[in-house]
C-alpha cells in the first residue's frame, strides 16, 4: 500500500513539474476577451484558479470576471467586493475588469433562488459591453452543489442558445474522493487528457501558479480565511487543475 501511494505521489509531482506539457486544449481559449462568471467573491480562486491564473498571464487575452453577488450573507458584502479586486490583481486582472452585481434578486445564500433569466441578463450586458468571445462558469452540479453556483450554469445555458457565437465552457465537478486528493488528482486528470476529447480543456497549475492561487486566496480574501479554508487550499484538486468542457 505504501508503494502504491508513493508511486502516485511521484507521478503527480512529475506531472506538476511539466504542467504546461500536461495541460491540453488551451488553444481553444486563445481569444481576445474571456469572461469568468461565478456567484461569490473567492469562487474565482477556490474553483477556477488554475484557469484564471493561466489566462491572466496571457497578455494577448483580456480577462474579465463577473461576480453575480457581493457575498453579503454574513453582512460583509462591501468588504468582499474589495477583496475580490485584490485577489484579481494577483492574476494580473485590472480592477476595471472586475464586475460585481448588485441585484436584490441575486443575493448570496443557500436558500436564495436565482432566476436564470436574471443571471443571463447580467451576463449578456458584460458580453455586449466588452465584446466577450468566451465564457467560463460552473457546470450543472456547481462543484459543491451550491444553488447559486448552479444558477450561474443555468443562466449561461441561456447565453448558449441566445448568443451562439460566444463559446461557453463549464468547470467539471468531480466526486468527493477526487475533490480532496489535491495533486494526486493529476493522475486521473492526465488519463482523461489522453482520451483526447475535442470539447475538453485541461489546465494543470505548476508550482508557481499554485502559489499565486493560494496567495490570491489567503491575501485577497482575508475575511473568508477561517480554519476549513486552509483545508481546501491544501487538499482541493481545484487548486491544482481544472477540466473545462464545452457547453452545447
Curated annotation (Swiss-Prot):
Biological or metabolic pathway of the protein: Glycolipid biosynthesis; glycosylphosphatidylinositol-anchor biosynthesis
Pfam families registered for this protein in UniProt: PIG-L (PF02585)
EC number: 3.5.1.89
Topological category with respect to the lipid bilayer: Single-pass membrane protein
Cell division found in the keyword field: no
One of the record's GO cellular component terms: endoplasmic reticulum membrane
Function: Involved in the second step of GPI biosynthesis. De-N-acetylation of N-acetylglucosaminyl-phosphatidylinositol.
Name this polypeptide is given: Probable N-acetylglucosaminyl-phosphatidylinositol de-N-acetylase
Gene: gpi12
